[in-house]
Curated annotation (Swiss-Prot):
Protein name: Phosphoribosylaminoimidazole-succinocarboxamide synthase
PANTHER family assigned to the protein according to its UniProt record, in alphabetical order: MULTIFUNCTIONAL PROTEIN ADE2, SI:DKEY-6E2.2
Keyword Signal: no
Gene Ontology MF, one: phosphoribosylaminoimidazolesuccinocarboxamide synthase activity
Organism for this UniProt entry: Salmonella typhimurium (strain LT2 / SGSC1412 / ATCC 700720)
Amino acid sequence: MQKQAELYRGKAKTVYSTENPDLLVLEFRNDTSAGDGARIEQFDRKGMVNNKFNHFIMTKLAEAGIPTQMERLLSDTECLVKKLEMVPVECVVRNRAAGSLVKRLGVEEGMELNPPIFDLFLKNDALHDPMVNSSYCETFGWVSQENLARMKELTYKANDVLKKLFDDAGLILVDFKLEFGLYKGEVVLGDEFSPDGSRLWDKETLDKMDKDRFRQSLGGLIEAYEAVAHRLGVKLD
């Protein structure tokens, strides 16, 4: 399967068409961004690590009965995926307080959240991804209530699967975001799951093993990503 025209260039991935109108090539680049793209740096091996990490996680989720767009790996930095009609709203699950939740509510970072919090954000860099709710989704026609309910169901199911997966690897799944789209009318998990879009802490030390290392200038970004991958059993080389 050969990639053809570039369709979309995001902050860390590029999407290409293929000869099959139902399939796309997703290329993971070495770019890393913070502040809605205001700060961008390149890190060697990052595209490869995130591509293989994402394929590993999507495979685990598919095995648990969650429909995903993943077809197969094509190269170190590319995978073949189904073409989805993307929903412009992302789903976030929070198992512990961190990031914007701490700033917004003034709660202590690391506070356990039981039951986990489910948030929705409009995907819009210019507006800094504002928080929305199901009423906004219905009024503005971003996604039907039926499909939104399915997105929420699948997000919580993914959380159950991934919390155990990371716990077994000595990691706390603090929070993560998922993006969904429609494929022939069915809600399907798209985009990616990687340390770029999740918060992962070491269970013993509470060291941050995700993109917060870049956001907070802690250093050791790729070393942390690779350490997480190795703990999970992701084959990188």
